[in-house]
């Protein structure tokens, strides 16, 4: 069977830059699934994405499905015919479904009986006939949150569509996709190259688009070119470009023919905190800031044009004129804000609502101040500095700079606090209170910052859960999942001596009578333990390991982490599987018994050597391991408990637990309960698979 290259390109108006990659990757994944489901042999499925196009190129695509033999088993002969040998309704219905009569059916005989059988040779359908529907289905499944309709048609897509190119080798596949009749026409760059041209063969893509249309269709190639050219441009001016991955992706999605240029701004603007300048350059203008080798911001920026100009200086000057007013605004806001102390903004917090039932930002500030001080006392941080940081924590939200450049919250608080002469750990805490902002983000760097960050997040968790507005489905308007994980990460990775139980109780207490959910403390703790589950799964721990620890509901995050590591290590021991199975057996035996057990094993009642030996080892280990449990040495404890494998195996091999003698039975059940209690001091290992 011959093979050909297949090309599909959807030419559109400008696609959303932040969604471009995901649209292209989903298109490729969807179409690959369609090919595989149809049984069409194919090679690599390569995706292309530019601001005004999505495309796929499939190598070595078979021209048709392979022929195949199908078999459909019908009713058993006993049910297929009545006593007179006439076909039953079941047999006739089955035959109609196969497109035959009962007389035409074959017989299938096995050692289990005889059945009606339909066999047929099905010729594979041509690829040309299958492709249009496969493309349409793949496009319909794209992750598009908001569809657009244009013109008088009812066609919906992420952006209006102008061209559809479907080529199998050199042949156009006739189809109407998204309201457009397919052909071999491709549109080039808006201002360079040929605005429109035809492509003779799918193998010519994407090179023909580069040569004639001045469009680099390969997304990764554009991105790599921007990165390399920007690094070289920065090197020429003695600096390093801030090429964050997210901005690189966005810029690569905005241009078809990237041309990297370097511009500058007035040095006087460097007196403004670099974060505000960078926010303007990256967030508003999509420019790449440039830093000196010592980490200081240079009065330069790198940007990417979408055209090769005969006069690039004109483009550079235009961009410099655009950015100057934004930088001047930042300078003005910075100078104006510093005319008063950060603390002077406190009264204005009373005018901003945090949440209707939970009060204003000033109310939240008071709670954070108190909770940060309480946390500082628990973890050995400076209580005065923590309460001071709590008092100032939201003051920068009332400044001109943060009002205009919202992403500078926190960092501007730090700069203004330093200007006011606040303690350095207080100033740093104002910046780091929102950390970690995302998975993998840095944690607060000092104890005061940790106390403030935890206090801010716990106040939000307690308040929102306290009024019954916990996250539902994928809706999480107060970012409670991120807040919970942030608290857990800080406590675990900084090894802080905090208990979720007392921490949540204190956060709830500070709300007074504002909360309506009587179960708020348990709800918050359960929610946070649930985030532990997600976190440890991401870290590579098995689900049953997590469940074994969760079963004990440890509320000290650092303690939870120690148990997780202990159980994970325990699983590597030779005795682990046998002891997990034994614990499961013990758990089942105890669950089936409703008899009241004694507090301790009666040694005089023990009879068999195996139970005597096991009882002695349980007693010895109980006393030996008590300091281990008290110190959180769970891994060492489980290693010691692994020594019980042989006596436990011997006990179950030789000793009957549920004997008729009540005293003996209860004594053996008590011993098993004491055995299980030892393991439960760490985790419920009966849940290990």
UniProtKB/Swiss-Prot annotation:
The keyword ATP-binding applies. InterPro entries: DALR_anticod-bd, Gly-tRNA-synth_bsu, Gly-tRNA-synth_heterodimer. The keyword Nucleotide-binding applies. It is found in: Cytoplasm. It catalyses: tRNA(Gly) + glycine + ATP = glycyl-tRNA(Gly) + AMP + diphosphate. GO terms for biological process: arginyl-tRNA aminoacylation; glycyl-tRNA aminoacylation. Keywords: Aminoacyl-tRNA synthetase, ATP-binding, Cytoplasm, Ligase, Nucleotide-binding, Protein biosynthesis. GO terms for molecular function: arginine-tRNA ligase activity; ATP binding; glycine-tRNA ligase activity. Transmembrane segments: none annotated. GO terms for cellular component: cytosol. Belongs to the class-II aminoacyl-tRNA synthetase family. Tetramer of two alpha and two beta subunits. This is Glycine--tRNA ligase beta subunit. It comes from Escherichia coli O139:H28 (strain E24377A / ETEC). The lineage of its organism: Bacteria, Pseudomonadati, Pseudomonadota, Gammaproteobacteria, Enterobacterales.
């Amino acid at each position: 069977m011959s093979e050909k290259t297949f090309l599909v390109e959807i030419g559109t108006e400008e696609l959303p830059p932040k969604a471009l990659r995901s649209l292209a990757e989903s298109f490729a994944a969807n179409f690959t699934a369609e090919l595989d489901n149809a049984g069409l042999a194919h090679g690599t499925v390569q995706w292309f994405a530019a601001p005004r196009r999505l495309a796929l190129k499939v190598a070595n695509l078979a021209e048709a499905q392979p022929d195949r033999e199908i078999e459909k088993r019908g009713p058993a002969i006993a049910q297929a015919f009545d006593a007179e040998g006439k076909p039953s309704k079941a047999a006739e219905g089955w035959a109609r479904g196969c497109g035959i009569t009962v007389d035409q059916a074959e017989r299938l005989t096995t050692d289990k009986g005889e059945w009606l059988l339909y066999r047929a040779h099905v010729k594979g359908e041509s690829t040309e006939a299958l492709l249009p529907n496969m493309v349409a289905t793949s496009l319909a499944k794209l992750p598009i949150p908001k569809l657009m309709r244009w013109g008088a048609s009812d066609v919906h897509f992420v952006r209006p569509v102008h061209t559809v190119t479907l080529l199998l080798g050199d042949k156009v596949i006739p189809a109407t996709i998204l309201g457009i009749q397919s052909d071999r026409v491709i549109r080039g760059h808006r201002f360079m190259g040929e605005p429109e041209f035809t492509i003779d063969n799918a193998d010519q893509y994407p090179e023909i688009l580069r040569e004639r249309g001045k469009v680099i269709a390969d997304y990764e190639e554009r991105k790599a070119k921007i990165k390399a050219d920007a690094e070289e441009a920065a090197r020429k001016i003695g600096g390093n470009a801030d090429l964050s991955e997210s901005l690189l992706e966005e810029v690569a999605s905005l241009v078809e023919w990237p041309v990297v240029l370097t511009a500058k701004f007035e040095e006087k603007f460097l007196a403004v905190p670099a974060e505000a300048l960078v926010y303007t350059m990256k967030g508003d203008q999509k420019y790449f800031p440039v830093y000196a080798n010592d980490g200081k911001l240079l009065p330069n920026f790198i940007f990417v044009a979408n055209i090769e100009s005969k006069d690039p200086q004109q483009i550079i000057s235009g961009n410099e004129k655009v950015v100057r007013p934004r930088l001047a605004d930042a300078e003005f806001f910075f100078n104006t804000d510093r005319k008063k102390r950060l603390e002077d903004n406190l009264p204005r917090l009373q005018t901003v609502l945090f949440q209707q039932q939970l009060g204003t930002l000033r109310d939240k500030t008071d709670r954070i101040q108190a909770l940060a001080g309480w946390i500082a006392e628990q973890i050995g941080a400076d209580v005065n500095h923590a309460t001071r940081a709590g008092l100032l924590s939201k003051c920068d939200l009332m400044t001109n700079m943060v009002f205009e450049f919202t992403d500078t919250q926190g960092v501007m608080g730090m700069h203004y606090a330093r200007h006011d002469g606040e303690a350095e750990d207080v100033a740093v805490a104002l910046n780091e209170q929102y950390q970690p902002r995302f998975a993998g983000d840095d944690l607060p760097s000092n104890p005061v910052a940790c106390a403030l960050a935890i206090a801010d997040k716990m106040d939000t968790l307690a308040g929102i859960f306290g009024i019954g507005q916990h996250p539902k489905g994928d809706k999480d308007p107060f970012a409670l999942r991120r807040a919970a994980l942030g608290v857990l990460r800080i406590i675990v990775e900084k090894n802080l001596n905090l208990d979720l139980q007392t921490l949540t109780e204190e956060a709830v207490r500070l709300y007074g009578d504002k909360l309506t959910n009587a179960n708020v403390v348990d709800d918050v703790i359960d929610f946070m333990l649930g985030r532990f589950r997600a976190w440890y799964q991401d870290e590579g721990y098995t689900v049953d390991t997590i469940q074994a620890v969760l079963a004990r509901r440890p509320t000290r995050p650092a303690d939870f982490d120690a148990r997780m590591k202990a159980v994970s290590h325990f699983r590597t021991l030779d005795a682990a599987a046998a002891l997990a199975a034994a614990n499961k057996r013990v758990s089942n035996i105890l669950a089936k018994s409703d008899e009241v057990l004694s507090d301790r094993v009666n040694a005089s009642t023990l009879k068999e050597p195996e139970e005597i030996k096991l009882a002695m080892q349980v007693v010895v280990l109980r006393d030996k391991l008590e300091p281990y449990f008290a110190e959180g040495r769970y891994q060492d404890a489980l290693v010691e408990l692994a020594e019980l494998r042989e006596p436990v195996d011997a006990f179950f091999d030789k000793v009957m637990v549920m004997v008729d003698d009540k005293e003996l039975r209860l004594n053996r059940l008590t011993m098993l309960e004491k055995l299980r209690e030892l393991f439960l001091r760490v985790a419920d290992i009966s849940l290990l698979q």
